């Protein structure tokens, strides 16, 4: 998390088994890796059986078994990190459902109406009141949700390929510069 270009590749590299199923045009396809190397080329398959016993009906399912030799004894992924990632991912893809199953078999679903829900929830988290409507823009390349609220400071968050640009970077700079240029004539 947090570094561009490594997400799924790093997970595969650090896994004993890494399997991805996806439903494409009504058919399930699967690709398998073992110890970070291709084990089976993509092939038609049955829907994967999920940890909670249900069969997936559509979408993409990723399952992996970490290579424990790469981790310190007792290393675990914190459930709070998995919850945060699941919630964030649902914000970034409108209508996508992310299901997180914990070690007890309990499943929580995260689904949202996209970036607008992220903005709404962030304003609520800050205990602020929104002033005006949320500006929304969506294209193939870009999604923008922008709102003003009665809160101190700036709370700008940028994401690229599902990963947060923690230090802002050019995405945030370009957004703020464009906003300032467009509002300047009205100040």
Feature names for model-found ranges:
Residues 44-47, 80-83, 87-90, 95-187:
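GHKL/Histidine-kinase-like ATPase module
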């Amino acid at each position: 998390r947090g570094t561009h270009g490594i997400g799924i590749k790093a997970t595969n590299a650090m896994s004993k088994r890494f399997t991805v199923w996806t439903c494409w045009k009504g058919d399930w396809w699967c690709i398998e890796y073992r110890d970070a190397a291709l084990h089976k080329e993509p092939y038609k398959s049955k829907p994967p059986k999920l940890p909670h016993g249900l069969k997936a009906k559509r979408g993409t399912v990723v399952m992996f078994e970490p290579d424990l030799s790469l981790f310190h004894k007792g290393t675990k992924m914190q459930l709070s990190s998995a919850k945060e990632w699941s919630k964030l991912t649902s914000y970034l893809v409108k209508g996508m459902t992310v299901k997180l199953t914990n070690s007890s078999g309990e499943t929580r679903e995260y689904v949202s109406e996209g970036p607008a829900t992220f903005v709404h929830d962030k304003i609520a988290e800050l205990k602020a009141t929104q002033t005006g409507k949320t500006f929304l823009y969506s294209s193939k390349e870009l999604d923008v949700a922008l709102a003003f609220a009665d809160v101190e400071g700036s709370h700008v968050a940028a994401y690229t390929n599902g990963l947060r640009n923690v230090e802002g970077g050019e995405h945030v700079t370009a957004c703020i510069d464009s906003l300032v240029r467009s509002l300047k004539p009205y100040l």
